[in-house]
Structure formats: structure tokens, C-alpha cells
Amino acid sequence: MEEIDDLGGLSKGKSFASMSKKDSDTLMIVDALNLSFRYKHFGQRDFAQDYLKLVQSLAQSYKAGQVIIACDKGSSSYRKSIYPDYKQNRKDKFETQTQEEKEAFEAFFQDFEQALLVVADYYPVLRYDGVEADDIAAWLVANKEYKHCWLISSDKDWDLLISEKVSRFSYVTRKEITIDTWPYECTRDNYLGLKCLQGDSGDNIFGVDGIGPKRAIQLLDSYDDILSLIDVLPIPGKQKFIQNLNASADLLELNLKLMDLVTYCDDAIGEENIKDMKEKLKC
């Protein structure tokens, strides 16, 4: 995987419109809140101008003619409607913070809001109540025209969108994930199935007890994909993990609805918000 070393900003006042027209077929989608956590990590305040310079620098590095800022605004209303405990663990953790930690987090979010205001003068910012950036990115990947798309996020969930035309850059690892540098032992097509079987502890999504990465990949290889596996349940076997799997058809179907960004992004964003996105982006 290629490493990116230079994340310096462009000179002050340089506008995105001045970039070469020859690069206009490259789309860059920025996971806005995710990218801002670099400043929280270093305890940096008043980072709005630095944030803008960082986005401009990334756009220059990837010769992006189109840049779109995708931003969370609360947890997904769609996911909570089908699974009320979605991300409940994060809420519980927040409630145990000290007063000092809460004040620091609130200060960070104030700075982040200011950064969004600054960056909005240069690029379209897509942000809607109860909609997550993952779903906005999935919709853009499916509906925008581009020669190649770069996703700027350290969130591995975005790897569900990787294809010949879509790649990801992580500012945390400073590495690129592409179809040619696919880092997982499963195939790209079975990455969703792997996630469904294992769950996602960060989002409070449970997997099948006793099924780790190796068993999950073996199952997906044997039955082609997660949908085919669900269709044939129950499968023969006396092992405990097989019994758990056979009892988990409903769980796996729920996990698909929670994790399949490509299939359910329209549901997660909502008709009115999609209409607004189309108007803003003229697509």
C-alpha cells in the first residue's frame, strides 16, 4: 500500500476553482468528522483554517476536480429504527465521562462546527439529521459520475465501497486501500459477509458467537456469499459455533440491513435528503 507523507496545506487564498480542468473526473469524498479527530487527538484548538488547508492539500495530491464533504449529524435514524440499541455502547460511555472530559469534547465540537463553516465556502457539505457520512458516501459512489473516487476516512466500514474505481486513504495509517492492495483475507465481495458474521463491537452490533475471521471466511468460501449462507441455514454440524450459526438467521439478516451501505443507503438517507443532495450537486 502506498504511503502518503505530505499532508501540508496549499498557500493561503488558493481556491479550489484554480485547479486544472484535466483533473475534473476525479471525485474525492471527505469523512468530515472522522478527519477532524486528528485535531482532537493532538489537543489542537481553533483548527478551522488548518482543516481547510488539509482538505485542499488532499485534493491537490489526488488531483481531484470534485470534492464533497460528507458529515454525520447524530447516529443513523434508519439503523435505530430497526435496531434501537445501535451505538448504545457509545452513549453509555459518554455518560461516564468526567466533567472535564465532557467540556473538552464540547469544545472540540465547537471548533469542528467552525471548520465546517469555513470549508463550506469552498466545497459542498452534505449533512442531515440522523444521517451518517458512510451512507452519504455510498450514495455518492453509486450516483455521481467520475473516473476515479478517493474516500478520505480511517473508517474501515468505507472499504465496503472499494472497487476498480473507488479507493480509500486513511490519515491514521497514512496508507491507501485500493482494489490492488486489498488488505483482508476474504475477497472484496465477501467483506460484507465477514462483517455480518463477526458483528461490529464499535457500533454495538453483535455477531455469531464462536465465529471469528477464519471460520467466517471458510463459511463464506464454502457457500459463496452471506446471502447464500443464510438461505441454506440450518446447515449440518454438531459444533457449538454451527448451532449458534443455525440460530442466527434473523441476526444475520438484521446485520445486513445495518451494514450493507450500498443496498440500504437510500433508506438511510431518506427521500427528501436525497432530493436536496441532487439539487446541491446538480446530479
Task: Name each model-derived stretch.
Residues 1, 281-282:
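Disordered, low-complexity tails and leader-like regions
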